[in-house]
Amino acid sequence: MVKIAVDMMGGDDAPGIVLDAVKKAVEDFKDLEIILFGDESQYNLSHERIEFRHCTEKIEMEDEPVRAIKRKKDSSMVKMAEAVKSGEADGCVSAGNTGALMSAGLFIVGRIKGVARPALVVTLPTTDGKGFVFLDVGANADAKAEHLLQYAQLGNIYAQKIRGIQNPSVSLLNIGTEAAKGNSLTKKAYDLFEKNQSFNFTGNIEAKTLMDGNVDVVVTDGYTGNMVLKNLEGTAKSIGKMLKETIMSSFKNKLAGAVLKKDLDTFAKKMDYSEYGGSVLLGLDGTVVKAHGSSNAKAFYSAIRQAKIAGEENIVQIMKDTVGE
C-alpha cells in the first residue's frame, strides 16, 4: 500500500479538481491511500482509503515562499510536507505556489545527504510520442558542473523507475553537439559526464532537436531549463492560437477543421506535457510532486499516479544509494 499526502487547497481551480482527481485515484488504484489536507467546509468525499485533515490556513499564489512556509504553520501545504518528513506519507502532491512548495521540500522534507542541490524535473513531449525527461527547470538558477553531474544521475534514475526505460540515454543541453562547444560550465560538465560510468552519456544536444525523441534525459542548469520550458509552452500556445484563427477565418477552413478535428485533438494531446504528470523535485528525502497551477482533474490525477509510482519503485532510497553519502 502506498500513502500519498495531498494539498487540497493549492491551484487555480482547487479544491474542485483536486477532489475529483483524488476520488478517481482511489477508485482506480486499490493499493493507494490518500491523506488530504484542507478546509473541511469544502471537503465532500467519503472513502475508506481517504483520510481528511482540517487545516486553518492556505498558502496563496502571491505569498512570498519562505515567509509563507515559516508563518503559515497550519496551512495545507506545510502539513502535507510534514506528513512526508515524518514518514507517514510516501510522497506528496500540490498544485499550489511553486516557490513555497520548493521551500517546503527543502526546509521540511529535507535534502538527501550528499545531494548538493535538488533539481526540478519534468517530462516533455516529443514528436514520436515517447517524451523525454528534462532537468533542472528552475529549482536553481545557478549551477556548477558537479551539480549537473548529480542532475544527470538523478534524471537517469527517474527515467528508469518512473518512465520504465531500462538504459536511458542522457545528453547535455548545449549550443552545439561537438564536445568542445559551449561555455566553461558545459565544457566541464561534459568532461565529468564522459568520465562517469553510472549512466549512458550520449553527448551534447541542441535545443532545436529536443523534441525529436532521440534522447531520454536532457540535463541543464535551472536558469536555462526554465527559459526553454517557458519557450516551449509559449510556442505550443501560439501554434494552437494560429491554427484556431486560420481554421475560423473562412467557411472553407471551418469545414476542413471539422474534418481534421480528431487529428488536431491528437496533436494537442501530444503537445500537452500534463499528460505525463507534474514536475518532481528530485534529491529530497521524500517524493514531492508539483502539479501545474492551472491543472485540470486529469492532470492532477496524473501527478498523483506519478507520486504513487515513485513510492512503489522506492525511488528515494535508490537515489540515496546512488548519490547520497
From Swiss-Prot:
Localization (cell): Cytoplasm
Listed pathway(s): Lipid metabolism; phospholipid metabolism
A Pfam family hit: FA_synthesis
Keyword entries, A-Z: Cytoplasm, Lipid biosynthesis, Lipid metabolism, Phospholipid biosynthesis, Phospholipid metabolism, Transferase
MF terms (GO), sorted A to Z: phosphate:acyl-[acyl carrier protein] acyltransferase activity
HAMAP family assigned to the protein according to its UniProt record, in alphabetical order: PlsX
Name this protein carries in UniProt: Phosphate acyltransferase
Organism of origin: Staphylococcus epidermidis (strain ATCC 35984 / DSM 28319 / BCRC 17069 / CCUG 31568 / BM 3577 / RP62A)
